[in-house]
Amino acid sequence: MHATTIVTVRKGNKVVIAGDGQVSLGQTIMKGNARKVRRIGKGGNVIAGFAGATADAFTLLERLEAKLEQYPDQLTRACVELAKDWRTDRYLRRLEAMMLVADKSVSLALTGTGDVLEPEHGVMAIGSGGNYALAAARALMDTDKDAEEIARKAMQIASDICVYTNNNFVVETLDAA
């Protein structure tokens, strides 16, 4: 998954998803201020960030919103139901995207193979700069920094290293349970 970095951090009473704004086509930067992190669900009670092919990501985001309408306040169930569809539907199986989603209780990654994963250490990252952001965020979890500070610093480090990630960040925060 090229051309983006998305990170989620859950620490203390906050959960954050942050993403950069760069859209690349091959080796060309097409846009620097894309919004790959957004609030979804009833009242914006879920935050989601996506990496991968833009049209594919929007398709999955729409499908997740439909599942959240079907299973309100049940993010895990909505994601599992979406993953089932993703694995069994011929059209959806061809989509090349990943998503990180979070609500007040849980953070999850939805992969292109239909997996639904919860982070072991409260941190997950996807995209071309995901490994850099993940390492940075994990290193910062034992500091006094809050979830948003950790996410921003992790994104800054990823943008300094990954050529497909810029420093035009969108950050969304929720109060955690």
Swiss-Prot record:
From its record, what is one biological process in GO terms? proteolysis involved in protein catabolic process
CDD domains referenced in this protein's UniProt entry, alphabetically: protease_HslV (cd01913)
Q: Would I find Protease among this entry's keywords?
A: yes
- Where does this polypeptide localize? Cytoplasm
Residue numbers annotated as active site: 4
InterPro entries per the UniProt record, alphabetical: ATP-dep_Prtase_HsIV_su, Ntn_hydrolases_N, Proteasome_sua/b, Proteasome_suB-type
Catalytic activity, EC: 3.4.25.2
Keyword terms, alphabetized: Allosteric enzyme, Cytoplasm, Hydrolase, Metal-binding, Protease, Sodium, Threonine protease
Q: Top EC class per UniProt?
A: hydrolase
Q: Which SUPFAM superfamilies match?
A: N-terminal nucleophile aminohydrolases (Ntn hydrolases) (SSF56235)
Gene3D superfamilies recorded:
Glutamine Phosphoribosylpyrophosphate, subunit 1, domain 1
One GO cellular-component annotation of the UniProt record comes to: HslUV protease complex
Principal cellular location given in the protein's record: cytoplasm
- In what way is its activity controlled? Allosterically activated by HslU binding.
Its assembly, as annotated, is:
A double ring-shaped homohexamer of HslV is capped on each side by a ring-shaped HslU homohexamer. The assembly of the HslU/HslV complex is dependent on binding of ATP.
Give the protein name, as stated in the record: ATP-dependent protease subunit HslV
The organism named in the record is: Mesorhizobium japonicum (strain LMG 29417 / CECT 9101 / MAFF 303099)
